[in-house]
Design a protein with these regions (language model features):
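Hydrophobic alpha-helical transmembrane segments of membrane proteins
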Residues: 1-159, 167-307
């Protein structure tokens, strides 16, 4: 049976493989058109690229007014620039920035089918949709762990950060803020989409609080591991980004948190109700994050200064 709509080009391409003359002709015309387009694009720039000498024009100085900013803002911009300047850093430690909005859009698109399915499977456990969707947000957010290797990535230039006229805590707080900013903002997309596909209940609000609490917990845990497991003997930045024990612990802790959040609810937490369960989980998560935040501000800052 012939297909129609967006899948029709694939149908024609498949028919060409069966020996259909018209389909083979159409496929050949499309390939030739693409070839002609690429030829036109390359003919404009290929010769210039291959004959370039690498010489560049002399830079002309233009006086500009520099806007004054606080030390905290300057440190934040420094850490953000370090993250965006490294493709390896962004790809391995910031994948959640892309996947969180994608997950939200998918939920908005398929939420009308997913939520009734969850209710049908776990009908006896009320509020299961809120807990499981919150679990999904936490699992995707765990892919952001840019604070964990940030201390080790200072490398031989660590002395610069230590010699700046700022406190060690200010330097650590800037690293913490980068992960929080780059995770909270994308996470708002799926959380808002959850509000669009689920009824407005206390458990829905608490699922958002739990997800944001986990993001704070994850950032504090990652930076704590980064300070305690700092290594400056690497020869490639991929070593602290992908191969360090601190990054591995941070990554697996996010998965374990998601498993615990969903698993404990399905085992026994549903008897408390989704709202009470999420409130308890959020409180415990914030308490753990608060303890690590206090350690970073006191002993962690001293340890960073002594590295």
């Amino acid at each position: 049976e012939k297909s129609s709509g967006a899948a029709h080009p694939l149908y024609v391409f498949g028919q060409a493989g069966t020996g259909d003359g018209l389909a083979m002709l159409l496929s050949a015309l499309v390939v030739l058109a693409l070839f002609a387009l690429m030829w036109a694009v390359l003919s404009r720039s290929f010769l210039q690229i291959t004959t370039a000498t690498g010489a560049s024009g002399r830079a002309v100085y233009r006086e500009r007014t520099v806007k004054r900013q606080s030390a905290d803002a300057a440190l934040f911009r420094k850490e953000l620039a370090r993250f965006t300047a490294s493709p390896n850093y962004m790809l391995n430690c910031g994948l959640g920035i892309l996947l969180l909005p994608v997950a939200g859009i998918l939920l908005l698109w398929k939420g009308g089918e997913v939520v009734p399915l969850l209710d049908a499977i776990f009908g006896a456990r009320g509020g299961c949709a809120e807990v499981l969707l919150c679990t999904g947000v936490c699992a995707v957010a765990s892919m952001n762990d840019m604070a964990t290797p940030s201390v080790s990535l200072e490398g031989k230039s660590l002395w610069l950060a230590q010699s700046l006229p700022v406190t060690p805590w200010q330097a650590l707080r800037a690293k913490l803020k980068v992960q929080l900013a780059l995770t909270v903002l994308p996470a708002l997309v799926p959380l808002v989409c959850m509000a669009a596909v689920l009824p407005l209940t206390p458990s829905l609000a608490l699922s958002a609080v739990t997800a944001l609490a986990y993001i704070a917990f994850s950032a504090c845990l990652g930076l704590t591991l980064g300070v305690t497991r700092a290594s400056f003997t690497w020869t490639s930045e991929l070593m602290p980004i992908k191969q360090s024990l601190a990054v591995m612990i941070a990554m697996f802790s996010g998965w374990l948190y998601a498993v615990a959040l969903a698993g404990l609810y399905l085992l026994a937490g549903w008897r408390l109700g989704a709202a009470a369960y999420l409130a308890i989980f959020a409180a415990l998560t914030l308490a753990a994050a608060g303890l690590m935040y206090r350690w970073l501000k006191t002993r962690g800052a001293k340890r960073f200064a002594a590295l």
